[in-house]
């Protein structure tokens, strides 16, 4: 990667635009959730990263539709919402200056014309104009795409089951789950969400707890000795209101090998927790 693969992302400077992207991305995830067969860990609600932004991946259409499937993409390079179908038709709408409600209505109309009926809560998509800073979006996309590459490398080196590198709109974060292969004592093995020992790794733009972008690593159940374990370079332990290892994004900006620092954080916490989970 280039030396500027990770641009500065101070949340205070683009939080309004981040919140706008959250509303736009919610449309993609809600459409996917409504039409995709249910999967464990809500993997029918997540989005994924492609070469230009966020994607729903292939969404199956109902049997009475005129197309077999479609895909929605939020292109963060061209600043556009794109809907493509298996019959070659599509729709492109600009994101800049777009009302979330209008995106919803246009998407609903396009799909309805092909026999795909959406039943979403229109109140989730405001009718008010929202800020959209193209330069800030492009910086975020540069960071997100490069983070996704590192997460992919981390996933490739994991033994055992792991989930897809996923994007979740409710917290606007990138996420990866890893499973130890052991069941959690006392939990019904049929409980798809909580029966398995697991770890979550992610990247978020910031929130009410940590008001700046950061990486996190958590474990379920949390090993008692993990909070006192030695953390990887640059990382700290977050104890309230949730517990997990944290690496501030800003640490990457001044590090000579930012990808190595991030990969070391992910691998280091995973190995430490995996030893203590046994």
Give each language-model segment a name.
Residues 2, 79-92, 119-135, 213, ...:
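Glycine-rich, often proline-containing surface loops adjacent to acidic residues and nearby aromatics
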Residues 2-69:
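N-terminal ordered "arm"
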Residues 63-73, 102, 205, 209, ...:
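Ser/Thr/Asn(+Pro)-rich, low-complexity disordered segments
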Residues 97-157:
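Internal, hydrophobic cores of structured domains that mediate oligomerization or house catalytic pockets
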Residues 131-207, 214:
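Aromatic/basic-lined ligand-recognition segments
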Residues 198-245:
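Low-complexity, glycine/alanine/valine/leucine- and proline-rich hydrophobic stretches
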């Amino acid at each position: 990667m280039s030396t500027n693969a990770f641009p500065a992302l101070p949340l205070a400077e683009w939080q309004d635009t981040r919140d706008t992207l959250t509303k736009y991305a919610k449309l993609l995830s809600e459409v996917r959730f409504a039409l995709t067969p249910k999967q464990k860990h809500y993997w029918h609600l997540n989005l994924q990263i492609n070469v230009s932004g966020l994607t729903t991946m292939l969404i199956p259409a109902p049997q009475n539709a005129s197309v077999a499937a479609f895909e929605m993409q939020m292109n963060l390079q061209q600043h556009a919402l794109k809907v493509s179908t298996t019959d070659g038709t599509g729709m492109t709408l600009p994101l800049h200056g777009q009302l979330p409600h209008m995106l919803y209505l246009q998407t609903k109309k396009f799909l309805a014309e092909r026999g795909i009926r959406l039943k979403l809560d229109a109140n989730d998509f405001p009718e008010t104009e929202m800020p959209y800073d193209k330069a800030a979006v492009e910086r975020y996309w540069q960071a997100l795409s490069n983070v996704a590459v590192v997460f992919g490398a981390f996933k490739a080196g994991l033994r055992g089951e792991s989930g897809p590198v996923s994007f979740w709109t409710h917290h606007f974060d990138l996420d990866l789950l890893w499973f130890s292969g052991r069941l959690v004592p006392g939990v019904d093995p049929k409980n798809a969400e909580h029966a398995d020992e697991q770890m979550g790794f992610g990247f978020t733009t910031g929130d009410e707890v940590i008001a700046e972008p950061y990486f996190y690593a958590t474990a379920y159940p949390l090993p008692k000795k993990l909070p006192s374990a030695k953390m990887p370079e640059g990382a700290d332990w977050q104890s309230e209101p949730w517990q997990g290892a944290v690496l501030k994004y800003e640490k990457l900006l001044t590090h000579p090998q930012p990808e190595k620092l991030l990969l070391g954080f992910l691998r280091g916490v995973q190995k430490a927790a995996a030893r203590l989970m046994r």
